[in-house]
């Protein structure tokens, strides 16, 4: 096998791996959003920014998951605001 062929095969493995990671992310996000009620407290602007960034990344890769932004907002809100806020 030539060096060029081995490099191209490594590139193929990486692209397959990335595809699997995104599909598992969307599946776990959908499952967690169906079973966990999340709500942030305090209204920190950082929470909305993180949610919007994650939503933009998912839409940019072709995976559209509408519930991910709300779930991320709740989780991050719980982490930033204290033990009484977040997912229940």
UniProtKB/Swiss-Prot annotation:
One of its GO terms (biological process) is sorocarp development. It holds the Pfam family Coiled. Disulfide bonds: none annotated. Belongs to the hssA/B family. PANTHER family: HSSA/B-LIKE PROTEIN 17-RELATED, HSSA_B-LIKE PROTEIN 17-RELATED. This is HssA/B-like protein 12. It comes from Dictyostelium discoideum.
């Amino acid at each position: 096998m030539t060096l060029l062929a081995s490099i191209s095969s490594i590139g193929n493995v990486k692209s397959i791996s990335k595809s699997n990671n995104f599909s598992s992310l969307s599946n776990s996000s959908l499952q967690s959003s169906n079973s966990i009620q999340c709500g942030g407290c305090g209204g920190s602007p950082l929470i909305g920014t993180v949610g919007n960034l994650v939503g933009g990344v998912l839409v940019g890769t072709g995976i559209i998951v509408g519930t991910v932004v709300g779930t991320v907002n709740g989780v991050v809100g719980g982490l930033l605001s204290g033990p009484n806020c977040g997912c229940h």
